[in-house]
């Protein structure tokens, strides 16, 4: 079974969403009469202002698989609270055997992240971040681990509400 990794392709639609294709794999299904070839596509979609979604699509042809993945990514979007083009605080994410460390960075640092994580930050609109992956480098698991970490982000207002204090008391 041959594996085909596509370069990350970017696209911006008329609805203001940024789309990136992370990978396209050739997959096979073995049946009594032989093998049935198909394609699986992994994509991320973001609005450049903190909203992000991931999708996976499978079909007999590449364009159809990519289209299915993009539609699924649009349906699965969620908002991540950003602070001046970076993350609120350091956070860990995990999925399967992939683990990621995501940390905010000073202005001018840029996106220091490898492979699929960079695509996630690009479509999300993060300009400064440092990210490190540990364990498996499977693109699907890395994207899911990155999204897991991003979901764990909390704002000072969230923490203040949980503790029953004001934001000024939390920030000192």
Swiss-Prot record:
Give the superkingdom in one word: Bacteria
**Which residues belong to any copy of the S5 DRBM domain?**
17-80
Protein family: Belongs to the universal ribosomal protein uS5 family.
Q: Which NCBIfam families match?
A: rpsE_bact
Please name the HAMAP family in this protein's record.
Ribosomal_uS5_B (MF_01307_B)
Its biological purpose is as follows: With S4 and S12 plays an important role in translational accuracy. Located at the back of the 30S subunit body where it stabilizes the conformation of the head with respect to the body.
Q: What is this protein called?
A: Small ribosomal subunit protein uS5
- The gene behind this protein is rpsE
